[in-house]
Each structure stands twice: as C-alpha cells, then as structure tokens.
Amino acid sequence: MAQAAKILDGKAAAAAIKSELAERVAKLKARGVTPGIATVLVGADPASQLYVSMKHKQSVEIGMNSIQRELPADATQAQVEALIDELNADPACHGYIVQLPLPKHLDTDAILERIDPAKDADGLHPTNLGRLVLNVSGEITSPLPCTPRGVIELLERNGYSLSGKHVVVVGRGVTIGRTIGLLLTRRSVNATVTLTHTGTENLSQLLRQADVIVGAAGAKHIVKAADVKPGAALLDVGVTRETDPETGKSKVHGDIDPAAAEVAGWISPNPGGVGPMTVALLMTNVVEAAERKLAAESAGTA
C-alpha cells in the first residue's frame, strides 16, 4: 500500500512567517519606523474587495500600518496614475499593490510600470524582474515575486531541499510560470527547471521526469495521477472556477487531479497551500523594503 503524501500546509508555514515578521516590525518600530503597506482598488469587484481586506487584516495583526486607497470603476487613467505618484512619494508607504484586474478601459501595464520599483510589493515590476535575471548568486536587494518565493519557502520550511532537483513548471504566466525559474535556478536554490504550458505536446512525458511539479496554468486537472513520478512533490497554484450545476455555487479546481495525491510524496492543498504563502511573502517584501530604506538612511545613502 502506498504511503500517504505529506501535506505541505501553507497556513502553518505562513503563520510562522507572520510571527517572524511581527518581531521584525517591532524592531523597526523601536527605531521609529512603522512599515506601511498600501493597496489600490479601482471599482467594487467583490472578490477583489475580499482579497484586499484580507491583506490589510493580516498586516495590521503583525503591527504594520495599513493604507487603503480606492477609486471608482470609471476612474480615468490620469486619476489612477496620480494616485500611484502619490504613493510613490508617501514616506509612510513602504510598499503597495494595485489590485488586479483593473477595469478594461485602463492601461494596466502603464500603471504597473509607474510603481516605484522599491515599493513593488508584488515583486513583478519589470525593473525588479530584470535585476533578478541579472543576479544569479549575489545578495538580492529588490522585492521578489511573491508566489514563486512562496512555493520555494513552503518546500524549504517543510524540510524539502530543492538542490539538484528537477522542477517541471506548468504555466507561462508572469505571476508564477515565467518568473519562478529565476528563483529556482539561483545558486542558493540550485534546482533545474523545465517550463511547460498548455501548448506543450509531450507534457505527460516531461511531467513523469519531475521531482517537483508546480501547476500554474489555470487548467483544471491538467496534471493527472499517471503523469506523476512516485514520491514527487506537487504544488498546485492553478485556479479554475466552475459553477456547480446542482448547487449553482462556484467551485474552485486546481491544476493537479486529486487522484495524484495517491502517487505523490508531498502535496500542497488548493486552497490552503501556496495561497496563504503569497500573502505572507507580500508582507515580507514590504517589511524588507522598510528595513532597506532605514539601512540606507542610517548609512546616509538614501
């Protein structure tokens, strides 16, 4: 009988990170700095409102300053950009996110690129991704992509070493697929990465070679049990929403077929796996930004 897969509990790992962050926030406050995290919400999408309120609740719990900025759904490009400029200049704000998706009439790329890279809480600003491309082994002094960092932290905090492992990533989105390889191939992590997607023809063959599979395509159950090497670690970041025809309620499906858990050695639940880690690492980026700013000011280089 196969041994049950070990659960990669994102809630427990995120709680540990938040406990560590609370200590770091207390040290900053003792030096007169309260890390400030801000969100920009345009419109009143219920899912976005819920996500934003959750971020603020958790940041306040660890002692951070919470700054919530909202604009109506018909806000102009100029109005949104003016708010971005305001947060860039606000010394009380150390990092912020623009909640996506934005209303369709707005130029999302132009807005995101206007964010001060030092205050990029998501870690997805082109400047910060460029720095990551150029930096294989040196110290990182810019925000890191939250979800990819969350995947790695979740494994490492469960005693799983990625060094020498073959990681197959399914999905080519910027949030995870295209960025996680930049972190996994750093010398400090030392994994080998194969990037696949919904258009990959020999996907099953590649998946069967993987020590670790990261499902991030947003394609329901694209990773089947037959695709998984026995003992592999499975991290499910994919989200597909479907309406249950019987109840009429929305149901979330991941990229990894639940039957794969019987073959895997490690598996992250979805939800409850990488999701909580993303929020914890978002707050980490902001606390680190506050620490860097204070260090620069103390050294007279700010």
Curated annotation (Swiss-Prot):
UniProt-recorded Gene Ontology molecular function terms: methenyltetrahydrofolate cyclohydrolase activity; methylenetetrahydrofolate dehydrogenase (NADP+) activity
InterPro entries per the UniProt record, alphabetical: Aminoacid_DH-like_N_sf, NAD(P)-bd_dom_sf, THF_DH/CycHdrlase, THF_DH/CycHdrlase_cat_dom, THF_DH/CycHdrlase_CS, THF_DH/CycHdrlase_NAD-bd_dom
Record key words, sorted: Amino-acid biosynthesis, Histidine biosynthesis, Hydrolase, Methionine biosynthesis, Multifunctional enzyme, NADP, One-carbon metabolism, Oxidoreductase, Purine biosynthesis
Metabolic or biological pathway, per its Swiss-Prot or TrEMBL entry: One-carbon metabolism; tetrahydrofolate interconversion
Positions of NADP(+) binding: 171-173, 198, 239
GO biological process: L-histidine biosynthetic process; methionine biosynthetic process; purine nucleotide biosynthetic process; tetrahydrofolate interconversion
Domain of life of the organism encoding this protein: Bacteria
A single GO cellular-component term on record: cytosol
One Pfam family cited in the UniProt record for this chain: THF_DHG_CYH_C
Entry's EC annotation: 1.5.1.5, 3.5.4.9
SUPFAM superfamilies: Aminoacid dehydrogenase-like, N-terminal domain, NAD(P)-binding Rossmann-fold domains
Function recorded in the entry: Catalyzes the oxidation of 5,10-methylenetetrahydrofolate to 5,10-methenyltetrahydrofolate and then the hydrolysis of 5,10-methenyltetrahydrofolate to 10-formyltetrahydrofolate.
Family assignment from sequence similarity: Belongs to the tetrahydrofolate dehydrogenase/cyclohydrolase family.
Assembly, per entry: Homodimer.
Protein name per the record: Bifunctional protein FolD
The species this protein was found in: Arthrobacter sp. (strain FB24)
Source taxonomy: Bacteria, Bacillati, Actinomycetota, Actinomycetes, Micrococcales
